């Protein structure tokens, strides 16, 4: 009787790492800290599969999604002329139009639309009429960043289609849920919000940002619970209105990113499948 051939053993299927989403939160000038976190991830060989940003985080997310490495992001940030992204308007629905910011983003992303960028990108803004969040994954990246960053009373609301939008930080200070919605299996959240600290606020812009911090605190606590890793750069002394402390913010992001690396690697190993 002929022997029945035994099929060769099937080699084990290699494990696949989880799909990683990077959620970059709002915090105005403190947003430069996101760059330091990105640099640490790159140096560790950890590459997010998608990035989503709110407010200041949307600007960094857009440039990162366009293929800018961390070192280049830092160079761009340190060279940024604040006046180049500020176009004052007559008092009305906002002191700043925001078109200069949109133009700057278009230039920095090579004029590509959101869906044409190398890395999947999501940008969160707030629908002014409904108060609901809107996740932009298609269209004009400059316009989406402008909408996401449109602090009410400072920036004019941004019309996209038939709707008007303002700062995404009002409804999603750190957009963890939207990273999940985009397909992330592991979410790294970077929280740069300035917690209300009881100190007296100075100018009107600082007072407005402090108000947002108070409003966003409970939303943040709820949303961050769904993140796998939360990175919180220590930004004491760096106010949301302080655009002169860019290098200090980037360095703070690096320190916080390095501190989170061990936990991140362990979480990635747990989610291999």
Residue ranges: model-predicted function:
Residues 1-52, 63-273:
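Patatin-like phospholipase
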